């Protein structure tokens, strides 16, 4: 087969896979936004069939022959096509090892589990969710062997979200964070606490929605290409670099919750919108890893969004949206309130300093679940034990405990460490960015274009063209958590007068 003809077939293959992705994503988006509560069963059948057809296309003899042919001609291919072939071969080999019936059943289970999780959380009923959680754990234990039988099961799953990461590396990473941050948290615990009571007045959802629209405008998110919806758990869903959807949740007694979830999900969206046009409709079109993705979301949410210059820039507008609630509250008071460091129950509402402790709880539980030393029925007790040990807080119920996140209901075991890695990647990127861009001058003007421009040049445009570690190295050098620890130490030492 001529190389040119083979590349045309490669393009068609990837567009077909993209079409399956769009169909599946559309069904999921409908499920969590507008679908009636009793519609999960039929949707699960459809999503299972789509998964089966996608797997069949990916593992058929014609696809394998095409990838073999192009691999043999690798020296004739440009970088983009070589990387496409490498990634598709990896997926092909993985999916070939998974029995088709098992793969389809798992996809149907994920749809059912998400529906059950929503009901269990609303009713604060872990017993309702427990059986499907155990099924998901059992599937993921088996799938880990299909992914890479040479690795420990949890290492194989971690590698699906952040290639090159394993438990040994994460144990060292989290221990470094513990050593650097826990003494700081204890010192702050001895200081007078910041008043954030004004954040918890009544903030009508309609006004919060209008403010969310304003924040998207400040971020430079083009509403022709980025939609904003409302769901129980905020998320980002990408179709291509001209069609990204984000969601948030409006708590009428916590205005900071939706504010920072919009900035967080907006960071994810900017990453997807910034990927090069020539990578669209290929396997390289999405973000390279969840760690790098979370570096972008948490960059805008925290490094920029909770900075004094940015808060001062947007605060007059915020007061205009909430004149009664913020009357007499200064920008400095607001800045201090949204940076208040205090151990809490809810991960997505945690402050920057204690956030990684929330991730560590989930990491320890996932290690045990996938390692076979913990069963689903025991998760609430272990969750409560670790929250008391790590954060010093009592877990009053499962809705605010182990049912608070949607990740496990979607089968995403191994995702959570990406949040902590992303936070550390982001701090390192900020240090490097400050050498090239007047970051704080731009933030003080409410002009994020120079910041986004730097990230687009160094990170976004490449999509999956490079390995995650190479993306980080290209942007800011070899990875180290020290910049993250120093950033938090400087910020909270000043904030609390340590």
Language model features with spans:
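Active-site recognition of the HExxH zinc-binding catalytic motif
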Residues: 10, 257-276, 294-298
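Divalent metal-coordination and catalytic microenvironments
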Residues: 10, 148, 264, 297, ...
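Post-HExxH zinc-binding segment in Zn-dependent metallohydrolases
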Residues: 286-327
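A well-structured
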Residues: 1-163, 464-467, 482, 489-498
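All-alpha helical catalytic cores of prenyl diphosphate-utilizing isoprenoid enzymes
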Residues: 174, 178, 205-209, 215, ...
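Contiguous, non-catalytic segments that form substrate-binding/exosite surfaces or channel walls
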Residues: 106-255
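Secondary-structure capping and boundary motifs in well-ordered enzyme cores
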Residues: 42, 102-105, 132, 204, ...
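C-terminal, non-catalytic "cap/extension" segments appended to globular domains
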Residues: 2-6, 22-25, 38, 42, ...
């Amino acid at each position: 087969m001529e190389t040119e003809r083979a590349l045309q077939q490669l393009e068609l293959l990837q567009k077909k896979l993209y079409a399956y992705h769009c169909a599946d994503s559309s069904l999921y988006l409908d499920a969590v936004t507008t679908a009636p509560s009793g519609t999960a069963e039929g949707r699960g059948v459809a999503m299972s069939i789509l998964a089966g057809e996608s797997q069949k296309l990916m593992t058929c003899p014609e696809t394998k022959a095409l990838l073999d042919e192009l691999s043999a001609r690798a020296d004739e291919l440009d970088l983009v096509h070589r990387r496409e072939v490498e990634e598709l071969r990896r997926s092909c080999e993985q999916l070939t090892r998974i029995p088709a019936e098992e793969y389809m059943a798992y996809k149907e289970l994920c749809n059912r589990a998400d529906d059950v999780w929503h009901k269990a959380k609303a009713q604060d009923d872990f017993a309702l969710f427990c059986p499907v959680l155990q099924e998901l754990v059992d599937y993921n234990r088996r799938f880990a062997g299909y992914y890479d039988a040479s690795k420990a099961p949890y290492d194989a799953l971690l590698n699906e979200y952040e290639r090159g990461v394993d438990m040994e590396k994460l144990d060292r990473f989290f221990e470094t964070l513990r050593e650097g941050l826990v003494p700081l948290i204890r010192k702050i615990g001895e200081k007078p606490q910041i008043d954030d009571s004004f954040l918890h007045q009544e903030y009508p959802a309609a006004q919060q929605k209008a403010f969310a629209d304003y924040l998207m405008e400040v971020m430079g998110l083009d509403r022709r290409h980025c939609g904003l919806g409302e769901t129980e758990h905020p998320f980002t869903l990408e179709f291509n670099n001209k069609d990204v959807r984000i969601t948030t949740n409006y708590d009428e007694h916590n205005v900071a919750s939706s504010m920072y979830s919009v900035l967080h999900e907006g960071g994810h969206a900017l990453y997807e919108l910034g990927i090069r046009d020539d990578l669209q409709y290929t396997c390289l079109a999405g973000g390279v890893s969840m760690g790098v993705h979370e570096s972008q979301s948490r960059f805008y949410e925290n490094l920029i969004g909770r900075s004094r210059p940015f808060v001062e820039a947007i605060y007059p507008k915020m007061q205009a949206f909430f004149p009664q609630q913020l009357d007499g509250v200064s920008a400095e008071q607001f800045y201090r309130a949204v940076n208040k460091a205090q151990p809490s129950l809810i991960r997505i509402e945690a402050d920057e300093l204690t956030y990684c402790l929330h991730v560590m709880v989930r990491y320890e539980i996932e290690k045990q679940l996938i390692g076979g030393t913990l069963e689903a029925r025991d998760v609430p007790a272990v969750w409560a034990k670790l929250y008391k040990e790590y954060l010093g807080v009592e877990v009053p119920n499962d809705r605010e405990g182990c049912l608070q996140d949607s990740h496990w209901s979607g089968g995403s075991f191994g995702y959570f460490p990406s949040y902590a890695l992303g936070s550390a990647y982001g701090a390192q990127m900020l240090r490097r960015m400050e050498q090239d861009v007047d970051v704080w001058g731009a933030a003080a003007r409410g002009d994020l274009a120079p910041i986004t421009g730097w990230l687009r040049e160094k990170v976004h445009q490449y999509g999956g063209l490079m390995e995650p570690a190479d993306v980080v190295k290209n942007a800011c050098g070899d990875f180290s958590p020290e910049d993250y620890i120093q950033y938090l130490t400087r910020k909270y030492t000043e904030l609390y007068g340590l």
